[in-house]
Structures are given as structure tokens and as C-alpha cells.
Regions:
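Surface-exposed loop/turn motifs in large extracellular/passenger domains
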Residues: 1-215
Length: 215
């Protein structure tokens, strides 16, 4: 599923929104994302509606087959007063790399408004390539937020064989996690179980990488 452009929106007047996508691709193709939101597209239930997004990256052997991928200024999954739940599983095969479960970058954001909680769950791709992150937030003040509710982030690094650098949760340069009301932040990460180096549970690093609770 691809949503692109400022006028591209999935909205409701108060009901829940459920979006499920599975990436395709074959051979050495890459960038086969399950749910792909870019160029200021939005998923936005109104009222007390909840947003439930699930994505599975495609299984081709090219790079970057994310389960759920948001990128670009104004690209959002948000709510008015409901919960936002995003679950992604990275794809890829063979030596494919950078198959994140959930990837938020380049000023995109995921976050519940009002009293809603934000829950992100990601599983990195099971390949022999590197950098299969469970949850990856990076670049241009990309954000995971909650206005008054809690933020829950759970990531499992992927990889197999000699694969490495498979972080469970990677909050990198200008990646921000911000509970800006009364909510709490819970982050749980497990590094990949492959035999390569640097399979870290939770990584926070790079200029501007931030985890902030105003409570």
C-alpha cells in the first residue's frame, strides 16, 4: 500500500481505521514496503477512532523492504483522541539489508493526539544482510509522539547467519521520541540473534537523537 502526496489521506469521522499491507517484489528488487506513507500523506481517524496499521515487507533479495515506512515532512499516522498502533515486520531474503520492521525518517511522524496511546512494534527482516532494525527513527526530526497518552516501543532485531548491526530499537540522528503531556515512555529492544557483531537491543546516538517525557 502506497500513500503519497499532501491530498492523499485515509480519514474517518470517528470510526477506527485499519490498514494492512504486504510488499511484493521478486528476484533482486528492493524497496518493497508493506505500508508506505510519503510526501505528506496522512492516516488520520477523527473523534475517538483508533488507527491500526500492519505491514509486512516483501521477500525479494534487494535492500530496504520495510514493514511500515513513513518518510517526508508532513507524512503522518495520527489520531484525534484514539490510540495509534503500528506493527511492522521487515522482509527481504538472502543477503538483503536494511529491512526494518517500522521505519520513520525525514521529518515524518507517528503519534496519538488527545488521550490516545502510541504503540509501535517492529521485527527486523530475517536475512543474512546487515542493519535489519526492529524500529528505526532517524533524520530531520522524525518523531514518535503522544500528546497525553503513553508511548510504547518494542523492537526485535532481525538477521541470521553472520548478519550484524541488527538493533531492536534504533533512535538515530535527529530521531525523536516525545511524550509531551502526562504520558510515560516504555522502550523495549532485543538485538538480533545472528553471529555478527553489534546486535544491540536499544541504540540512541547521533546529533539530535532524543527521548523526552514531560511528565
Amino acid at each position: 500500500i502506497v500513500l503519497t502526496g499532501n491530498n492523499t489521506r485515509i480519514t474517518s469521522s470517528g470510526g477506527d481505521i485499519n490498514v494492512t499491507g504486504t510488499g511484493g517484489g521478486s528476484g533482486t528488487s528492493g524497496s518493497n514496503h508493506g505500508v508506505y506513507v510519503l510526501n505528506a500523506a496522512k492516516i488520520f481517524p477523527g473523534g475517538n477512532g483508533h488507527a491500526v496499521i500492519e505491514g509486512q515487507g516483501g521477500t525479494a533479495s534487494g535492500a530496504s523492504n520495510s514493514g511500515v515506512y513513513l518518510t517526508g515532512t508532513g507524512s503522518q499516522i495520527t489520531s484525534t483522541n484514539g490510540h495509534v498502533t503500528v506493527t511492522g515486520t521487515g522482509g527481504g531474503s538472502m543477503g538483503s539489508s536494511m529491512n526494518a520492521g517500522v521505519l520513520v525518517d525525514a521529518s515524518a511522524s507517528i503519534g496519538a493526539s488527545g488521550i490516545g496511546n502510541t504503540t509501535i512494534t517492529g521485527q527486523g527482516g530475517n536475512t543474512t544482510g546487515n542493519s535489519n532494525y526492529g524500529v528505526f527513527v532517524s533524520n530531520g526530526n522524525a518523531m514518535i509522539t503522544a500528546s497525553q497518552g503513553d508511548i510504547n516501543i518494542m523492537g526485535q532485531g532481525g538477521g541470521n547467519g553472520t548478519s550484524g548491526i541488527n538493533f531492536g530499537v534504533n533512535i538515530s540522528t535527529q530521531g525523536i521520541v516525545d511524550a509531551n503531556g502526562s504520558g510515560n515512555i516504555f522502550i523495549s529492544g532485543s538485538g538480533g540473534i545472528s553471529s555478527g557483531a553489534s546486535n544491540v537491543g536499544i541504540a540512541l546516538g547521533g546529533p539530535g537523537a532524543t527521548v523526552l517525557s514531560d511528565t
